[in-house]
Amino acid sequence: MILPRHVLLFLLLSAIASSAIERDVVVYGGTSAGVAAAIQVARMGKSVILIEPSQHVGGLTSGGLGMTDSGKREVIGGISREFYQRLQKHYGNDGAWRQQKREDYQYYKASDDAIWRFEPKIAEQTLRAMLAEARVEVVYGQRLNLESGVEMLSEVSTSGGRSRRSHAITEIIMESGERYSAKMFIDAGYEGDLMAKAGVTYTVGRESNSKYGETLNGVQTKNARSHQFDADVDPYMVPGDPASGLLPGLHGGDPGVEGEGDHRVQAYCFRMCLTDAPENRVPFPKPEGYDPMRYELYLRYINKGWRTIWGNHKAMPNRKTDTNNHGAFSTDNIGMNYAYPDGDYATRERIIKEHEVYQKGLFWFLCNDPRVPGDLQNKIRLWGLAKDEFVDNGNWPHQI
C-alpha cells in the first residue's frame, strides 16, 4: 500500500517529536547546585543537559540570597569556591562599583581570595559564564509533566541466592512533550519533583521525636526563642473581644503536643534586594489585592514599641541588601505554604503569588499607611527595590 505524501510527512514529524534527546546525564533544576553538577559532568567529558523550568539559573543564589551562610569558609572548595573566587575577581574591578566606592564596603578585602556577599544579577552573570565556559547545554522554560513525566525500568537481579529489584529512570517528559533520556538523572530542584515522581520516599513536615529516637524534632514550643513577640499584642478583630474573631494570620488552635510531628513546614519569603541609593531606587509597589487589615497585627505590635524592622538587613555591594525575615511579624508569610511541597503547579503558583502580595503589601503598608508612626515611616521610605535587579520581573525576586 502506498501512503499519501501528507500521511508520510505526518508520521515522520510524529516520530521526530516523540524521539528523546539523549545525554549521558540530565540535570533537572538550575539552582546553584544544579549548575555545579552540570559543570562537573561536562568537565568529566560526559554529555549533559541542564533543564531549568524558569528563565533563570542560580535559584536563591541569584534570587536575592546574597548573604552566604558560609560557616567555616576554609572547608568550602571545588566549584562552589570557584564561584566565590570569580565574584571576588569581579568586585576587584573598578567598574563593578557604581553606587559606592569599593573602600567603603567593609566586606570586600583585596587580600581575600573570595567574597561571600554579592548582588543577585552578578551571581547569575557569573553562573551563566561558568556554564558557557564548560559548554553546558541549558534548556529554559521546561517543566516536568507531573502526571506522567517519569518513565522507569524495573529489573530483578540475583546475587548469592538473593533477589534484588532495582528501579531506574529511563526518560523524563516535559509538559511541552519534549523527552529526555540519560544514563543518569540528577534532581537539583528545590521541590524534588523528579525525585518524588520516581518513587523515592520522603517526608513533608516535621517528624516526631519518636520517629528516630531524637529530641529536637516535631513541635518545639519550649525551644522557641527567636522571632517571638516580646510584648502582649491584642489578637482580636475588635480589641478585647474574643467573639469578634482573630486577626488575619493568626491560628487559634493548640500548637500540638511537644515533640510530635505534623504537616507544618518552615515559612517562606522572598529575599528582597533593596537599596537606599536614590538613583537606583524604585518605590515599593502597591500590589493588586492589597488589604491593610492583613497588617493590623503588625500595627498593634509597632504601637507597642517594636522598631527593629531592619534586624536582618544585610549589606551587599553597591548599597544593596539581602533583606530577610526578622521578628514575630515580618517578611515570612507564616502558615501559608503548607500545601506547596506536594502541590501541583497551579497550587504552587497561587501560593507564590499570595506570598508576593503579602510581602509587597507589607512594605506598601509601612511606607503609606497614615497610622504607621512617622519616625518609622521616614526610615523605611529611604529604601526601595533595586532598579537594576530582576529587571524582567518588576525588580522583584524570581525565586521564593
What residue ranges belong to the model's regions?
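Aromatic pocket-lining residues of Rossmann-like dinucleotide-binding sites
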Residues: 41
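Conserved N-terminal/central alpha/beta ligand/cofactor-binding core
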Residues: 46-47, 52-146, 156, 203, ...
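Beta1/beta-strand and adjacent pyrophosphate-binding region of the FAD-binding site
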Residues: 21-31
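Bacterial N-terminal signal peptides
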Residues: 6-15
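N-terminal Rossmann-fold NAD(P) dinucleotide-binding loop
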Residues: 34
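Flavin (FAD/FMN)-binding glycine-rich loop and adjacent Rossmann-like elements that form
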Residues: 163-170, 177-184, 188-400
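Second-shell loop/turn segments in exported
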Residues: 26, 69-72, 111-118, 181, ...
